[in-house]
Structures are given as C-alpha cells and as structure tokens.
C-alpha cells in the first residue's frame, strides 16, 4: 500500500522555510530580534566563518578523534553562516548537528585518554554514542527546537568534566584558553537575556573567542596524546 508523505515544515527544493499553521520554530538570536525576526544577521553570519578558519590557521590535530573535532568545527562555521544569514531550518540543522558531533568526538577522545582499554571504557563510550544518536534524532523534531540549548548544555558539561579530569591526570594547562572561550560565552548569554543594540555584539564575540580559546585546548590535549605515543607502543585500535 503506497504512502503519501506530506512535507509541511520544509521545502527541500528551495532550501527555505515554508509556512505552517501549526508548527513553527523561533530565531532566538538578539540580532534578528532587533530586526523583527528577519534576516540576515550580518554580524552573526560573517563572524561565524572565524570558526571555520581557525583550524586552518593553527593546524589540525594528529590524534584522529581530535582531528574529527577540528573537521566538525570547520564545517560548523560554514553551517552557522548559512543559519544566521537565512534563518531557516536547513541551516539550523547543519549548525547544531556539527556542534553535537564535535562534542561527541571530543568526549570520545577524552574518555580514551582517561581510561585504559577496558569494559568500563567501552561502556562509557557506548553511553556517549547512544546519547549522541538520541540527541540527533530528537533534534530533527521541530517541536523540540527549544530544548537544544538545555540538552547541549548538559552534553558539553560532561565534556568539561572530562577536560578537567584528563588535564589533572596529565598536568595539562588549559584554564587560560578555556577562560577565553568562557568570556565569549558570557557575551553571548548576556546578548540573549538583555538584548539591545549594544549587547547584540555578544554573539559575534562568542564566534571570535570560542574558537581562539577552545581550539588551543584541543591542540594542547593533542600534544599530550602524541607525547604518550612516543613513550609506548600503542595498539593501533587505540587510535580508532
């Protein structure tokens, strides 16, 4: 029996949002709120490209899992540009999926650095993979649009805990660079909660300071991983 599929949310031929009387999603960025929720968000869009440029300036990590994080960040800048410029569902998915995957690969790498090959490590990685998959699927449902910041906040919180754990374990200095990203995050939060013509620049500040700080943290952890490789012969599976 054939199925008739009705696409109410999105016109994939034009890559633009189409009207739906029952389902909508909000553009909760200060710059577009000041423009009656209309694009393009010029400042937000063009500063997003900084995220894509940073990996090419500082270089890509050697450890495959951290290399994947860098690749996702390079993709994220372009996807974020599309989202902020066109304010459509396609751009939103591209932006948020690359964020989820970047955190997934980063957390996977941190888990492997912190735990030796064991059943416990495998179980933690399984949980990370399951969480990522459920998050991706639920995020495609337009009614769940408002949940992304909260769920991603929990997910990134787990990564921050692992950054602290691994840094303490191997005596890696990360506080200064993570602090730079924190300043950018603070600017973004202020812009969304106290939106005006001045605070709207908090989001572009995030696009600048987040990659400058966080990417250096990635490179420091990659340097540590490579130094470990020089002192012991690792199983090739370790780097998968």
Where are the regions that the model predicts?
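Multi-pass alpha-helical transmembrane bundles in non-GPCR membrane proteins
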Residues: 2-240
């Amino acid at each position: 029996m054939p199925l008739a599929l009705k696409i109410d949310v999105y016109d994939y031929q034009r890559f633009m949002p189409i009207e739906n009387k029952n389902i909508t999603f909000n553009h909760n960025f200060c710059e577009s709120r000041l423009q009656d929720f209309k694009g393009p968000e010029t400042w937000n869009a063009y500063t997003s490209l900084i995220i894509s440029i940073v990996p090419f300036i500082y270089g890509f990590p050697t450890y495959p899992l951290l290399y994947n994080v860098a690749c996702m960040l390079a993709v994220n800048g372009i996807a974020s540009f599309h989202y902020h410029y066109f304010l459509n569902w396609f751009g939103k998915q591209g932006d948020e999926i690359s964020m989820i995957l970047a955190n997934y690969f980063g957390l996977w790498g941190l888990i492997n650095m912190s735990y030796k090959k064991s059943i416990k490590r495998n179980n933690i990685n399984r949980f990370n993979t399951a969480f990522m998959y459920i998050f991706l699927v639920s995020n495609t449902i337009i009614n769940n649009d408002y949940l992304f910041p909260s769920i991603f906040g929990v997910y990134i919180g787990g990564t921050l805990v692992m950054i602290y754990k691994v840094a303490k374990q191997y005596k890696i200095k990360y506080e200064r660079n993570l602090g730079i990203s924190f300043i950018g995050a603070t600017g973004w939060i202020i812009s969304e909660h106290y939106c005006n013509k001045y605070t709207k620049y908090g989001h572009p500040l995030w696009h600048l300071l987040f990659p400058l700080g966080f990417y250096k943290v990635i490179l420091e952890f990659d340097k540590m991983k490579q130094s470990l490789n020089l002192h012991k012969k690792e199983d090739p599976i370790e780097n998968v």
